[in-house]
Amino acid sequence: MKMYAQRALVLLSLLSFATVSLALSSCTTLDLEHIKKKRVEAIRGQILSKLRLTSPPESVGPAHVPYQILALYNSTRELLEEMEEEKEESCSQENTESEYYAKEIHKFDMIQGLPEHNELGICPKGVTSNVFRFNVSSAEKNSTNLFRAEFRVLRVPNPSSKRSEQRIELFQILRPDEHIAKQRYLSGRNVQTRGSPEWLSFDVTDTVREWLLHRESNLGLEISIHCPCHTFQPNGDILENLHEVLEIKFKGIDSEDDYGRGDLGRLKKQKDLHNPHLILMMLPPHRLESPTLGGQRKKRALDTNYCFRNLEENCCVRPLYIELPTDLGWKWVHEPKGYFANFCSGPCPYLRSADTTHSTVLGLYNTLNPEASASPCCVPQDLEPLTILYYVGRTPKVEQLSNMVVKSCKCS
């Protein structure tokens, strides 16, 4: 009994002391050059591992990459940035085996023509929607490896628009049936009709997966105005038979030739890289043999917004730019030439910076047992993907590498 009382007094004294003088983490503080060297080696191993390569490709590809391939790379990079922003806003985090390995990026441009049996002539007067068709049959053999699919369309300003904003809704077109609807609602949002051009992105993973498994279900997508068969007065009263016109214009759709709802119109430029398209992220089967699903919640940590603006001495994310040709000695990666990989550094004071009660108890335990396990260290918490462009022989590859950019840190 006396022994337990003595231990309790020791713990209480340690708690009192910690509130006045914070003990620092025992993790060794490294100089920048040593950190950069270790980080470079880690990145080298990460990239090869995520691509399932044992060594860098010998072929470096052509000296000049075609514009179409660069456009796909840029479009993918922009899409991933949007996805990371959405993930941050929803406070969600995915940490699965499928997240780890690199994804092959495939782009499918909109094609002309309407599918059979999907005449959606509910509102014959005025243009109330646009239909978008895609041929994704080349990806059917890898249908089970679809990781994500995004529908992207470029909104362009409409100077003659009568309203500054309009609500649009995205639908999957279904085969007509007396007992089911002709459309399946996917998403909706308010969009500006004027202003600078902007890309609109919609998650259509489930829809595209259905198309890949059942080709006959691929009847296209439709963007329609909300409540297309009537419009509204300023006070909210409904005006029947006064059809609201879709005033939002999209790049690649010749609106002047649209005369009826569901009329696709014609493509202004068939090869225009800004036309509506799908981006499919596919996980090659040889990179994932036994996929698992999972997820967890996360909380905000010491991120770049805070650490890059403040002279924080404790645990924080630090900027570190890696030049792939110079630091890695690689010429086979065409884009990017370099990127901010960043790293975590700084001491972890007990009781204040630790992110869990477990870390506090661990600190006290280590004080009583100095030869036991190490104290909390400054480690990455949030990481973002990196898009790369490289060649395998003469074939260009645009792929997404997960967890390559450190965005925030924590003590753990």
Curated annotation (Swiss-Prot):
Motif Cell attachment site mapped to chain: 261-263
PTM comment, free text: Transforming growth factor beta-3 proprotein: The precursor proprotein is cleaved in the Golgi apparatus to form Transforming growth factor beta-3 (TGF-beta-3) and Latency-associated peptide (LAP) chains, which remain non-covalently linked, rendering TGF-beta-3 inactive.
SMART domains: TGFB
InterPro entries the record matches: Cystine-knot_cytokine (IPR029034), TGF-b_C (IPR001839), TGF-b_propeptide (IPR001111), TGF-beta (IPR016319), TGF-beta-rel (IPR015615), TGFB3 (IPR015618), TGFb_CS (IPR017948)
Annotated glycosylation sites: N74, N135, N142
Keyword Disulfide bond tagged: yes
MF GO annotations: cytokine activity; growth factor activity; identical protein binding; transforming growth factor beta binding; type I transforming growth factor beta receptor binding; type II transforming growth factor beta receptor binding; type III transforming growth factor beta receptor binding
SUPFAM superfamilies xrefs: Cystine-knot cytokines
UniProt cross-references to PROSITE patterns, sorted A to Z: TGF_BETA_1 (PS00250), TGF_BETA_2 (PS51362)
Gene Ontology cellular-component terms listed: extracellular matrix; extracellular space
Family: Belongs to the TGF-beta family.
Name under which the protein is recorded: Transforming growth factor beta-3 proprotein
